[in-house]
Amino acid sequence: MTPHINAKIGDFYPQCLLCGDPLRVSYIAKNFLQDAKEITNVRNMLGFSGKYKGKGISLMGHGMGIASCTIYVTELIKTYQVKELLRIGTCGAISPKVGLKDIVMATGASTDSKTNRVRFLNHDLSATPDFELSLRAYQTAKRLGIDLKIGNVFSSDFFYSFETHAFGLMAQYNHLAIEMEAAGLYATAMELNAKALCLCSVSDHLITKEALSPKERIESFDNMITLALEMMS
């Protein structure tokens, strides 16, 4: 047990899917897993363990932003011995290469947060995912006929107050989208010798101002959930 997770040791499987929204975690448990069991609920940040095609897998919410995400990731790795962490979330596209409903695989994560500089003695850390997880995601997407969009993301500490004038520069440097956690997830996994990857479904396009309806968001997210579970099974 930790200050933020009240699961017992052994409740988490070595592979864990992460979502910012705990209700999305509950949705996955109820609609995609067999024998799903709630294992933690501190602060209503829900976690579950269950089976997908006979293989054990866990789910955990992590809240919004790098600070919240890294708390849960650290505790999952250090206390519960989770080895592979796959974040599945939403993002806002900033590149013409990406459209609504596309799934982005973050091969690197830049950030305006100072957390990684503090972690890395004020140097620039190359926050990258695990190669083997990335390869599995790519191969699984090919098998499922999913056109995975591959490139960098920008993990921002800001949801509302953001430097919109920088979108063009980010796109020039092959940043496909903006989200809020990948840079912290990758850095924490690197520090603690675990494997991590971030997949994001495009729910909004910050340049064209297009956005999915609530129904379309659910349908789009279901495709990413299937990809995530298939690559972990």
From Swiss-Prot:
Please name the InterPro entries in this protein's record.
Answer: DeoD-type, Nucleoside_phosphorylase_CS, Nucleoside_phosphorylase_d, Nucleoside_phosphorylase_sf
Quaternary structure, from the entry: Homohexamer; trimer of homodimers.
One biological process term in Gene Ontology: purine nucleoside catabolic process
Q: Which residues form the active site?
A: 204 (proton donor)
**Which UniProt keywords are present, listed alphabetically?**
Glycosyltransferase, Transferase
What's the source species' lineage? Bacteria, Pseudomonadati, Campylobacterota, Epsilonproteobacteria, Campylobacterales
NCBIfam families listed in its UniProt record: deoD, PRK05819.1
Tell me the residue numbers annotated for binding phosphate: 20, 24, 43, 87-90
Protein name according to UniProt: Purine nucleoside phosphorylase DeoD-type
Q: Which PANTHER family match?
A: FI09636P-RELATED, URIDINE PHOSPHORYLASE
- Role of this protein: Catalyzes the reversible phosphorolytic breakdown of the N-glycosidic bond in the beta-(deoxy)ribonucleoside molecules, with the formation of the corresponding free purine bases and pentose-1-phosphate.
Which chain positions carry the site (Important for catalytic activity)? 217
- Keyword Transferase annotated: yes
SUPFAM superfamilies annotated for this entry?
A: Purine and uridine phosphorylases (SSF53167)
Q: Which family does it belong to?
A: Belongs to the PNP/UDP phosphorylase family.
For binding a purine D-ribonucleoside, which residues are annotated in this chain's numbering? 4, 179-181, 203-204
This protein's GO CC annotations:
cytosol
Q: What is its EC number?
A: 2.4.2.1
Q: Which GO terms describe its molecular function?
A: purine-nucleoside phosphorylase activity
Q: Which reaction does it catalyse?
A: a purine D-ribonucleoside + phosphate = a purine nucleobase + alpha-D-ribose 1-phosphate; a purine 2'-deoxy-D-ribonucleoside + phosphate = a purine nucleobase + 2-deoxy-alpha-D-ribose 1-phosphate
